[in-house]
Design a protein with these regions (language model features):
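Membrane-embedded helical hairpins/re-entrant loop segments and their flanking transmembrane helices
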Residues: 63-87, 247-262
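Alpha-helical transmembrane segments and their immediate interhelical loop/hinge regions
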Residues: 204-257
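Membrane-interfacial helix-loop connectors
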Residues: 77, 248-308
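Hydrophobic/aromatic residues in alpha-helical transmembrane segments
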Residues: 26, 64-69, 104, 240-247, ...
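Short helix-coil transition sites and intra-membrane helix breaks within transmembrane domains
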Residues: 59-65, 71-74, 93-102, 272-285
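Helix-boundary and loop/linker segments of multi-pass membrane transporters
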Residues: 9, 39-47, 75-79, 111-112, ...
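Transmembrane helix-loop-helix hairpins in multi-pass inner-membrane proteins
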Residues: 1-41, 85-197, 280-357
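Alpha-helical segments in transporter systems
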Residues: 12-15, 54-58, 126, 224-236
């Protein structure tokens, strides 16, 4: 019992102390590095037409990304429900980065009786595809920059190559496992029999594995579906790059496509790291570091574009998220207290289409 209270106390310190402090430190560094008056001047002079266009592109990004998740789920569930659950995931991430990845399978289980492990598997596949898509697009951008004679920071090149290589290998392994589910589960069952585990626990592990692989069932689909999956991944992040480009145009910058996508890759990958609520401070800091490292400037305009982009993201995700609360019939209190929920039961089975009232 004491260990449980100690663990909960540490979680609270991390969530409400350390993570917000990271954002405060990031903002302090930005304030010391860039003239605040110049930033405010750039924001006041931002062109509304470009800002609205960026907001429209972000909306399309959310729609297309939800369509890809709808595809991963086998189109067994209404697209509108999938979109609103995705929106609630963004809302949860604003409150506590990483919470959205738990909220989405939890909501699928609640509304459509999808086993939690199977739902989580689809979310994990989503994130894997996101990192793969961004890294491969970014790597191509870096090669283009190098061919053009532009210098690319070694750390950015390393991030691009590392993430692209790692995600490609994981995708290949997942692809093979998803196409040989019975063999994988049988192999795990044989291994577990050699371990000092109770039969019930061993069977539970096999059930979880079966559910996880059920969530990756799309990797067993036809070639046209595979093309749609990977093509929609590239399309999703190219649309996101367009939204970032329009944010830059709002403050008078016109980055080259390779610079635009390369910097965006660094920003997106950084969101997998510990961050304060809403990524406030860290988003702007990584944006400035990445794009300045790629030679884009002046820094006041680069940071102003980051504030425009992030401001639109927060406004849209909060708006769509609260609309999603009404559509999915869940309260904000339930969503934000998700981490206090009892561990959901994993169940073997596919992605059922049964809806709860």
């Amino acid at each position: 019992m004491a260990d449980t209270h100690l663990g909960a106390s540490r979680q609270r310190v991390w969530r409400y102390g350390v993570l917000p402090l990271i954002g405060v430190v990031a903002i302090a560094i930005l304030v010391l590095r860039v003239d605040v008056g110049s930033i405010l001047s750039e924001l006041r002079g931002a062109e509304p037409t470009w800002v609205l266009a960026s907001a429209a592109a972000l909306t399309v990004f959310y729609l297309v990304r939800a369509a890809r998740w709808h595809l991963i789920l086998g189109r067994r569930h209404p697209y509108t429900l999938v979109f609103w659950i995705s929106s609630l995931g963004y809302l949860a991430n604003n409150a506590a980065p990483g919470l959205g990845e738990l909220a989405k399978p939890w909501l699928l289980r609640r509304r459509r009786s999808v086993p939690f492990a199977a739902g989580m598997s689809t979310v994990m596949l989503e994130r894997l595809l996101d990192f793969w898509g961004l890294a491969t697009i970014g790597l191509v951008s870096f090669v283009v920059l190098a061919v053009q004679g532009s210098s690319v920071p070694g750390w950015l090149l390393g991030v691009g190559a590392g993430v692209a290589g790692a995600t490609t290998l994981i995708l290949i392994a997942t692809f093979v496992a998803a196409r040989n589910t019975d063999s994988v589960v049988s192999w795990i069952r044989r291994v577990l029999k050699r371990l000092p585990l109770s039969p019930r626990l061993a069977e539970r592990v096999c059930d979880v594995t079966d559910s996880l692989l059920a969530g990756a069932a799309i990797l067993r689909s036809s070639l046209p579906t595979q093309i749609a999956l990977f093509g929609s991944t590239w399309a999703t992040w190219l649309i996101n790059a367009l939204a970032a480009y329009l944010a830059f145009r709002a403050v008078g910058l016109d980055p080259e496509p390779a610079v635009l996508v390369g910097g965006l890759m660094a920003v997106a990958v950084s969101q997998g790291l510990p961050a304060p609520p809403g990524y406030i401070g860290t988003y702007q800091a990584v944006w400035l570091l990445a794009y300045s490292g790629l030679g884009l400037g002046p820094e006041e305009k680069v940071l102003a574009a980051a504030i425009v982009s992030h401001g639109l993201i927060l406004i849209l995700t909060v708006t769509y998220g609260f609309l999603g609360l009404q559509s999915v019939l869940v309260s904000a209190r339930e969503l934000l207290s998700l981490r206090k929920e009892p561990r959901p039961a994993f169940a073997p089975a596919g992605l059922t289409s049964k809806e709860k009232p």
